[in-house]
Amino acid sequence: YHSAKLKFYIGDVRDARSIEQAMRGVDYVFHAAALKQVPSCEFHPMQAVRTNVLGTENVLEAAIGAGVKRVVCLSTDKAVYPINAMGISKAMMEKVMVAASRNLEGTHTVICGTRYGNVMASRGSVIPLFVQQVFAGQPITITDPAMTRFMMTLADAVDLVLYAFEHGRNGDIFVQKAPAATIETLAHAVTGLMGKPEHPVQVIGTRHGEKLYEALLSREEMACAEDMGDYFRVPADSRDLNYGKYVDQGQQRLTQTAHGEDYNSHNTQRLDVAGMRQLLLKLEGMQRLARGEVVDVEEG
């Protein structure tokens, strides 16, 4: 792909110098580089740290040094209550981002982030796998029929990033309100769209590091989140390291969480098969599949 507006570099977020070179003359940065495959990160956790944590530090330091106006870091629902190496590394990525945002006095750089769930048909996601299995005449394999995941289109994910770009302040994390579905519902929606509603589904059990459901906001974050309509904004904790004052000063919001709840894929809007099918039809590849074409549905 050729465009006068694009310039490509060979580099790596692990290589600070290559990032510094790419950052020259840049106004805005969208940091999406990551190791995101949960099982791979379970077996190679330090590789996740080097890319997701130290790589983020390299990006932010280079952006600040180059005088970049705005940086948006992309995170994941797996960073909330993390139980796997990928989620832990992305939670640390968020902490690195928020910490960097606290030290920007005298600069023109704003650093904020987004957190979202499953982007349907993205690279490495389950929908392209389901489609391949149907075409191959193999049973669709699911880990746990009751497992729920947030469902977002690629367009939704882009909208979230642009919203953060336009409205973010230093240390903010933005979450888009999204529906969810069980993996079983998703499988039946895919087979129905492909004209094979009776295609067999096989339960194989969970993979390394998987959760039954995902959360986009913890209870503690929900207590301080600002509802912005289609989005939540979680501001950075503005307190400093002067712990002496905490002897007689607390934080009221943390006492409000005892009877609250997090925002997760079990308590958000739940899609049935018909609703999931309608959401799938927002994807061009799934529209073509519904017309009987043989296509690659993977997006991004």
Where are these regions (language model features)?
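Residue-level recognition of oxygen-bearing side chains
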Residues: 18, 28, 54, 125, ...
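Conserved Rossmann-fold NAD(P)-dependent oxidoreductase catalytic core, especially the SDR/UDP-sugar
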Residues: 31, 35-91, 95, 99
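Conserved sequence/active-site signature of Rossmann-fold short-chain dehydrogenase/reductase
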Residues: 14, 79, 119-121
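Conserved Rossmann-fold cofactor-binding substructure of NAD(P)-dependent oxidoreductases
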Residues: 2-28
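A secondary-structure boundary/capping signal
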Residues: 9, 34, 75-76, 115-116, ...
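Short, glycine/charged-enriched secondary-structure capping and boundary segments
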Residues: 23, 43-46, 86-89, 127-129, ...
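Strand-loop microenvironment adjacent to phosphate/nucleotide-handling motifs in alpha/beta enzyme folds
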Residues: 59, 65, 95, 99-300
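Hydrophobic/aromatic anchor residues within beta-strands of the central parallel beta-sheet
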Residues: 8, 48, 111-114
